[in-house]
């Protein structure tokens, strides 16, 4: 196995075509095909499946590519430092479900370290994508929640993907809504009282299983349910349609504004917010600092 072969696999996956990849690499297609066949034979892994429509990456190939990207990136960092003599910037990337406090923690991290010597990335995305991002080394850390309902399924998935879940916060469930909502001044709300109002939920795409829902009580038969892709749309729906969503009770007015509130839901449900990371891989200094910032919200959760 050579560094060149690893670079070839990354180029093919990006292009989706052996011919296009060969052009970008400035080598002949037969030479590229031979190099990939030799790599697959050596590793015993079918990385690509040839189809009439081009090249498709196999599930085993996705895992292989995750490691290949890491090796190539590390080599390029060493090359920049010791050969090219260029000062490379340290990188930190995090993926998360839609949590304003997790974004706020990221903001504080960037403020502390600055962007002259560091390169940051934040991905607020779907549950399954959070897990995939960590699995494929796109992100070092993934922020999500588990509870009694989804714990078994997600734990099995973490194990299969070589990930570990670490607990950060335990929260009760709150109803997040516009302050102009007729129930906004209540101390506690039941699901029965909410049945005439639209429940807002984040769309999970092709992995739209109850187990991947970002909101607890995902199996409840809501009379009115609206899916949204982003937080801004959801906030607009809260005002325009008197909608609501279920949340952790950790409220950050810095990002959402002061026009919204959280009212305790009459439920014994507990959600555990934590992070997933690659098993056996040490968290970087930036990653540890980010987790410290998130832990500061432990005492800010509504009781």
Regions found by a protein language model. Name each.
Residues 10-28:
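Short helix-boundary/capping micro-motifs
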Residues 40-57:
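A short LG(V/I)-centered, amphipathic sequence patch enriched
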Residues 89-152:
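Central regulatory/effector-binding core of bacterial HTH transcription factors
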Residues 135-140, 145, 204-261:
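Hydrophobic hinge/microswitch elements
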Residues 160-166, 171-172, 232-281:
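Beta-alpha-beta core module
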